[in-house]
Amino acid sequence: MIEKSMPAQNTHAADADLIGPDKSLLIVDDDTAFLRRLARAMEARGFAVEIAESVAEGIAKAKTRPPKHAVIDLRLSDGSGLDVIEAIRGRRDDTRMIVLTGYGNIATAVNAVKLGALDYLAKPADADDILAALIQRPGERVEPPENPMSADRVRWEHIQRVYEMCERNVSETARRLNMHRRTLQRILAKRAPK
């Protein structure tokens, strides 16, 4: 167990021991400042970091050298991080992947987990949260959130889940939710509630 009084470099050395022998980490995010900051923080914790700023670059790096660990933003400027997850999983089935999302869209995050991601974290996640998620052992319990979702947020997430299940078909989603199509379009156009 790491004591809080340990110096930072000893803590990071202990982190490196928890990572395992293959320390490769691919971080895919189109927010350059966040990407570089996270890459430095994860290198300090013992990872051998490679970065990609797009889906295309992430897939290319995954094909060239499939990583043991990956942190992937869900929404990238040229597409979905789900494509990077599929590319990694197609090359290496033991990769520990975490999905980052600035939108907190549970339906899409569930799809990411089904494709092989371990977990998803809301942005901006800090390096310690990401490290904890990457090294979490199977069966370990994660602390529940201190402030659960509001009723409006739960409704939004349900609508998003059905929307994803209907392959983003507004008319079909509206029919399944017993809602007028224009009402659904207005809801989807708004930002997610807190």
UniProtKB/Swiss-Prot annotation:
The lineage of its organism: Bacteria, Pseudomonadati, Pseudomonadota, Alphaproteobacteria, Hyphomicrobiales. InterPro entries: ActR_PrrA_rreg, Bact_response_regulator, CheY-like_superfamily, Sig_transdc_resp-reg_receiver. The modification 4-aspartylphosphate is found at D73. Keywords: DNA-binding, Phosphoprotein, Transcription, Transcription regulation, Two-component regulatory system. Member of the two-component regulatory system ActS/ActR acting in acid tolerance. These data implicate that a two-component sensor may be involved in pH sensing and/or response. This is Acid tolerance regulatory protein ActR. It comes from Rhizobium meliloti (strain 1021) (Ensifer meliloti). GO terms for molecular function: DNA binding. Phosphorylated by ActS. GO terms for biological process: phosphorelay signal transduction system. Residues 24-138 form the Response regulatory domain.
